[in-house]
């Protein structure tokens, strides 16, 4: 998407990679929600606030969510390549924490 100039789509996909990683972790605790806010709140309360994951991940989630909402819902929002690249980098960082967690818990 970056190569094709589809920066809004890149922001969307970066967010959803984070969101579904959160859902995977939450599922291990038997939790899911039909609302994004519920999924994120459960993760923050049960994993970030308890120190399982660093607080930095909450910031990554918030930035990704805000970017995705702008990209998806604001008619005149123009996403930049730089913004998309930064969001993809944050999503990769987030994924690395999730991967380590899953490996440490013998899921991967």
PLM regions: where:
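Terminal alpha-helical segments
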Residues: 1-108
